[in-house]
Amino acid sequence: MEQSPRAELEESMQYHHPEKTLAELPGGQEIADEMLAPFFGTDVRTYREIKGAFAERARRCARELLESVRFARFVDRLPFEPGSTVVGLGDSITDDAQSWLEILRHLLAERRPEDGIELLNAGISGDTTSGLLGRFLDLLERDPAWIIILIGTNDVAFVRDPRTKSLVSREETDKNLRTLRDLTEALSEARLVWMTPPPAIEARVVESSSLCEPTWRNADLAEVAKLVRGVAGEDTLVDLWEAFGDPPEPELLLPDGLHPSLAGQRAIAAALVEQLGYRR
């Protein structure tokens, strides 16, 4: 089904954030909405309206989760020290304007506003483990206390025929994941949290992609999830195959079968908080 111009704009703004790239330029720390709106071919008022709607949905998810006294206690027990920096790394699942990390941001704002915990969303749509490795040292310079990694979905993307080369080979994905871990241990005091890429609904993925567009198979995503489990070792591991189910619950994924819906992002945030809060 063809999208309306408004729906296309909202999707573009949901998964693309040019301010992350612009912030790396000299004097680019504060990027005004007046500069960002033209990137999407819209006016400032519409840009702010859509941006605010994403934030409100993430805030609403956080408040709904906090209606559970048990869950609220897990948020209180999250091992993030006051004033610390928590970095979330990954692809569009993290870069999503209403992602698990944005929900986590609102959870902390609701329950622990005085702690001054900084959450840095360093997800980049379309990223792979190779791309993440290329920018990882710059992220370590932010001196994070915690690094949460959810990466690998795009590594196994291929164009229609599964015999074609995936974006990143399994061997390279494994090496990249291990290098991320080794660099963290050697150059940082940060604690690592690993999340497996979630499963997809293959039928939806096939239906929503054209002949020349990348596609995905659950068998390949399962292999990456296995690699993440192997690399995690004694670090905290959040297994999203357990959180989503195998096969995944349909409402947790968008019609494209790959990206988490708002309910899916909420499930990721809940699994992360429960795992970290329980381990403490």
Regions found by a protein language model. Give the residues of each.
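N-terminal secretory targeting modules
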Residues: 1-87, 109-115, 141-142, 186, ...
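Alpha-helical cap/lid subdomain in secreted, periplasmic
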Residues: 2-14, 102, 106, 110, ...
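Catalytic nucleophile-elbow at a beta strand-turn-alpha helix junction centered on a G-D-S/GDSL motif
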Residues: 83-101, 156
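Short glycine-centered, acidic/aromatic-flanked micro-motifs in structured strand/loop junctions
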Residues: 89-91, 121, 151
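Conserved donor-binding loops in enzymes that form glycosidic bonds
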Residues: 91, 124, 258
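Short beta->alpha junction loops
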Residues: 120-128
